[in-house]
Amino acid sequence: MGGKGGKGGKGLGKVGAKKRHSRRVIRENIQGITKPAIRRLARRGGVK
């Protein structure tokens, strides 16, 4: 039953560091999140 817990968190440091003073852009990004994007984010967080 040996198994290592694999959490993928490699290049997550730079995410969201660029847009600091643009709330409208962030809002558009939230609205623009589609299923593939959600899948990608989930995969990054270690969710299948």
Swiss-Prot record:
InterPro entries: Histone-fold, Histone_H4. One of its GO terms (molecular function) is protein heterodimerization activity. Residues 1-23 are annotated as: Disordered. Keywords: Chromosome, DNA-binding, Nucleosome core, Nucleus. It is found in: Nucleus; Chromosome. Residues 1-14 have a biased composition (Gly residues). It comes from the Eukaryota. One of its GO terms (cellular component) is nucleus. The keyword rRNA processing does not apply. Disulfide bonds: none annotated. The keyword Transmembrane does not apply. PANTHER family: HISTONE H4 (PTHR10484). Belongs to the histone H4 family. Core component of nucleosome. Nucleosomes wrap and compact DNA into chromatin, limiting DNA accessibility to the cellular machineries which require DNA as a template. Histones thereby play a central role in transcription regulation, DNA repair, DNA replication and chromosomal stability. DNA accessibility is regulated via a complex set of post-translational modifications of histones, also called histone code, and nucleosome remodeling. The nucleosome is a histone octamer containing two molecules each of H2A, H2B, H3 and H4 assembled in one H3-H4 heterotetramer and two H2A-H2B heterodimers. The octamer wraps approximately 147 bp of DNA. This is Histone H4. It comes from Blepharisma japonicum.
